Amino acid sequence: MEKRILGLDPGLATLGFGVITCTQIANKVPETTVNMLDFGVIKTSADVEMGLRLCTLFDDLHTVMEEFQPDLVAIEKLFFYRMSSTILVAQARGVLILVLGQRRLPYVEFTPAQIKQALTGYGNADKLDVQEAVARELDLDEIPKPDDAADALAVALTASYQL
């Protein structure tokens, strides 16, 4: 059985997405294969009014959902030290959750520490360790760029380990 998982790294200026397929093969010992379909980012400009930025996220997220038809969406939970950053990302995250609700799509959320633990075995791993694990798990020649897209793939992989 194949599942398509969309990983999202929420952000207002840059929202990363990564799409993988997870196929379970029924042998004597069940085996799962994971393949990367696509990754990228949705960008908005700080020079544009907030409402228009959120509309861009809304429209572009619908486009991604329409193109890839995910079965499950995995989202990185908010984790910030600065309140101003948290508020901006929370607004973008609200749009994201709205799009998922409109499409009746199930979603799961993971903290940064859960993602690091799942991919590296260490909850305090650094960003490069996680990105290298993403490239290794997906059999990629290099780390996906930009970082937001690599992070989104990490979130999707974390969800695939829970299936």
Curated annotation (Swiss-Prot):
Binding-site residues for Mg(2+) 2, renumbered to this chain: E76
One GO term (biological process): DNA recombination
Stretch forming the signal peptide: none
One Gene Ontology MF term: DNA binding
Top EC category: hydrolase
Active site: D9, E76, D148
Alphabetical list of Gene3D superfamilies matching this protein: Ribonuclease H-like superfamily/Ribonuclease H (3.30.420.10)
SUPFAM superfamilies, A to Z: Ribonuclease H-like
Cofactor(s) named in the record: Mg(2+)
Alphabetically ordered keywords of this record: Cytoplasm, DNA damage, DNA recombination, DNA repair, DNA-binding, Endonuclease, Hydrolase, Magnesium, Metal-binding, Nuclease
EC number: 3.1.21.10
Cytoplasm as UniProt keyword: yes
Catalytic activities: Endonucleolytic cleavage at a junction such as a reciprocal single-stranded crossover between two homologous DNA duplexes (Holliday junction)
Keyword Nuclease attached: yes
Subunit description: Homodimer which binds Holliday junction (HJ) DNA. The HJ becomes 2-fold symmetrical on binding to RuvC with unstacked arms; it has a different conformation from HJ DNA in complex with RuvA. In the full resolvosome a probable DNA-RuvA(4)-RuvB(12)-RuvC(2) complex forms which resolves the HJ.
Protein name stated in the entry: Crossover junction endodeoxyribonuclease RuvC
Gene expressing this chain: ruvC
